[in-house]
């Protein structure tokens, strides 16, 4: 006997860059590579590089990240369509993928495990609230003091270090901060001034400190040097919503 129930028709697939490369969070080291899928036409606009997706993998629905969209598949067989786009927010940049890949290779790890630790879990309410918030146009305050290297003038190589940052170079340096300095010349102020020089040169800055006490000091120094809402604090203490909001900013 033949069933009279018609089979559901498969989704039409997009024709523009129809092959997404997906890093699947399988947790298995022998599957530590990209997998190719197909993009249904209804997901074409949303399934962009950097977004979270759900994919069918070995009979299960697993999480993944789209890391690229390609015109042609490298896999010779039939491609499985993406199940859905979890969020249209691109949380994974090519630079972050490359860094996570380097960390995984360096320590014999799995890319999916590194990304799970590097990218905070999605918080839908925080994502929605940030999307509805008006954009903040914050500009750098005018520099104070005799010049951008004022706090660094006490260090023989300080002005040269800042100059190389301003010129787009990547100088390596170790700073032994002088003790007993006033706040405007203490090490948090030096870090904040170096960050400002890098930002003036159109670059990003990541400052890592060992504990919350140092975090508070650097936070105050950055507000003084850069103005409000020019940087974010990333810690585990505020909880998932605040951490995810800071990540998206």
Annotated model-derived regions:
Residues 1-249:
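Accessory, non-ATPase domains that flank or precede helicase/AAA+ motor cores in DNA-metabolism machines
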């Amino acid at each position: 006997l033949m069933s009279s129930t018609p089979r559901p028709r498969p989704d039409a697939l997009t024709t523009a860059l129809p092959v997404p490369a997906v890093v699947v969070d399988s947790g298995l080291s022998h599957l530590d590579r990209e997998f190719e899928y197909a993009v249904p036409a209804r997901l074409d606009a949303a399934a962009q590089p950097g977004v979270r997706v759900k994919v069918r993998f070995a009979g299960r629905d697993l999480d993944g990240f789209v890391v690229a969209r390609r015109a042609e598949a490298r896999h010779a067989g039939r491609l499985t369509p993406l199940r859905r786009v979890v969020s249209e927010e691109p949380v994974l940049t090519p630079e972050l993928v490359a860094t996570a890949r380097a960390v995984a290779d360096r320590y014999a790890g799995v890319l999916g495990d590194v990304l799970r630790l590097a990218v905070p879990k999605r918080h839908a309410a925080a994502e929605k609230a940030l999307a509805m918030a008006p954009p903040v146009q914050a500009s750098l305050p005018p520099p104070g003091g005799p010049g951008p290297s004022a706090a660094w003038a006490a260090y023989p190589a300080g002005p040269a270090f800042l100059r190389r940052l301003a010129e787009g170079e990547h100088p390596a340096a170790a700073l032994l901060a002088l003790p007993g300095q006033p706040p405007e010349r203490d090490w948090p102020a030096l870090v904040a001034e170096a960050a400002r020089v890098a930002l003036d040169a159109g670059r990003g800055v990541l400052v890592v400190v060992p504990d919350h006490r140092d975090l508070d000091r650097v936070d105050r120094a950055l507000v003084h040097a850069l103005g409000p809402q020019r940087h974010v604090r990333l810690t585990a203490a505020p909880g998932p919503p605040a951490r995810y909001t800071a990540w998206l900013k």
